[in-house]
């Protein structure tokens, strides 16, 4: 494989301080083989995954150093004017202008935007670009997104123009073909790896046994249905709790807990590190994923890495990613067998639990960032004809 220069842009790293999209791009960037000379077109960001790149400064530094000792009405507007006068644009444009500068310079063979803005199109000068599509959630659930959402509008525009499209699962690839009409041979499936540690340096002390729910709880995540269907199991096991990460519970969720007499049974835990996450997974009775749709489902791999039994809605990409190393239930607005499957896991003998965990480790071996980065490098070379 010949050496190739690849330019990534700033988008995911200014959208998120942490999150799946920016973390995935950073893991790929870090694990690319030596034959790929990669650069990220970004000057400042508060994203936690990019902080080790010395040339990238914290975004808040420039903002805070300007009349930092004084607070007064209108200071925010003054900052906007300061940015325009001194940096050629407010913070998002600061990175965008730098990306355009590098695009114009042309020291790359392949461009890989990290989200769906089309700002780069006039500056490619015939060079190919790769587009990663993590999921088709906005297209499949339009009721939860605005009609002019950038993902919907720009995905539709950019996908036909890309030299190659990366899908993170075969299920996502099928959705891209069906919804966007992209030819099969243009879409390459590259699975994610898992960034979790193998052990935890910090053991969280939790007195009650618990089920673990990770991440967002909105809409297609099926959290409300999960609360409804898990109620009989919780009421028959007084010691059991449901530990939830992500944002704090809102009023609607608290009302839902009260309705089912579960006010003390759902507990929110704010996670501040991978070590804490690992410990939460490792101590749980099981990790439960009731979501109706995901592009990949990285928490499945995290649970596998932490030797935590996994209970999945039999939907979307879950069977593809988890294989036979998870337990599956069905869930819809009418019915669910989740209680039956929870009771099964609850009553596992040590031998049965260990057998499931052994399958998880076998399955986990299929996913690594090194393998993903090598596959990506081959695609870069193929489309650049090097």
Regions found by a protein language model. Give the residues of each.
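Carbohydrate transferase catalytic cores enriched for Leloir-type hexosyltransferases
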Residues: 1-386
């Amino acid at each position: 494989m010949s050496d190739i220069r690849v330019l990534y842009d700033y988008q995911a790293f200014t959208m998120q301080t942490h999150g799946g999209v920016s973390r995935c791009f950073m893991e790929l960037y870090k694990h690319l083989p030596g034959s790929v000379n990669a650069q990220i077109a970004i000057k400042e960001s508060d994203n936690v995954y990019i902080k080790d790149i010395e040339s990238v400064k914290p975004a808040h530094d420039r903002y805070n150093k300007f009349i930092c000792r004084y607070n007064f009405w209108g200071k925010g507007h003054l900052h906007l004017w300061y940015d325009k006068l001194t940096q050629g644009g407010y913070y998002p444009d600061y990175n965008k202008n730098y990306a355009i500068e590098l695009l114009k310079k042309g020291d790359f063979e392949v461009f890989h935007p990290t989200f769906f803005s089309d700002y780069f199109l006039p500056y490619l000068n015939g060079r190919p670009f790769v587009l990663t599509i993590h999921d088709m959630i906005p297209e499949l659930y339009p009721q939860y997104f605005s009609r002019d959402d950038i993902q919907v509008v720009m995905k539709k525009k950019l996908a036909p123009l890309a030299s190659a499209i990366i899908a993170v699962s075969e299920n996502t690839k099928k959705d891209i073909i069906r919804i966007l009409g992209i030819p099969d041979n243009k879409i390459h499936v590259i699975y994610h790896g898992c960034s979790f540690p193998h052990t935890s340096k910090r053991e969280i002390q939790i007195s009650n046994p618990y089920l673990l729910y990770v991440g967002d709880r909105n809409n297609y995540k099926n959290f409300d249905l999960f609360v409804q269907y898990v109620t009989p199991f919780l009421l028959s096991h007084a010691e059991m709790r449901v530990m939830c990460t992500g944002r704090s519970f809102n009023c609607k969720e608290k009302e839902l807990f009260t309705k089912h007499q579960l006010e003390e049974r759902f507990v929110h835990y704010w996670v501040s590190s991978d070590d804490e996450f690992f410990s939460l997974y490792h101590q749980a009775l099981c990790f439960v994923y009731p979501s109706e749709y995901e592009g990949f489902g990285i928490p499945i791999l995290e649970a596998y890495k932490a030797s935590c039994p996994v209970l999945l809605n039999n939907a979307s990409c879950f069977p593809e990613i988890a294989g036979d190393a998870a337990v599956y239930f069905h869930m819809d607005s009418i019915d669910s067998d989740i209680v039956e499957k929870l009771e099964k896991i609850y009553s596992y003998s040590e031998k049965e639990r260990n057998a499931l965990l052994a399958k998880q480790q076998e399955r986990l071996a299929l996913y690594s960032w090194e393998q993903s980065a090598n596959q990506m490098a081959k695609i870069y070379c193929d489309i650049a004809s090097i």
